[in-house]
Amino acid sequence: MPGVYLNDDEYNFDIALRRFKKQVEKAGVLSEMKKRQHYEKPSVMRKKKKAAARKRLLKKIRKMNMA
């Protein structure tokens, strides 16, 4: 879990909040929370994963054809 520790000379709340938000984003806490908000069947997860892989592949092929 991300956490921000302030030094003795750091009393600025805005800087601490910005650092905390950056750590939360880097750790992927919000995306994980959204993903776990509702139960998703394993079959649906597999379908989404397969569709994402296909989309990445088509994007890669399209990019190679442009170059």
UniProtKB/Swiss-Prot annotation:
The keyword Ribonucleoprotein applies. Coiled coil: none annotated. One of its GO terms (cellular component) is ribonucleoprotein complex. Pfam families: Ribosomal_S21. The keyword Nucleotide-binding does not apply. It comes from the Bacteria. Belongs to the bacterial ribosomal protein bS21 family. NCBIfam families: S21p (TIGR00030). HAMAP family: Ribosomal_bS21. This is Small ribosomal subunit protein bS21.
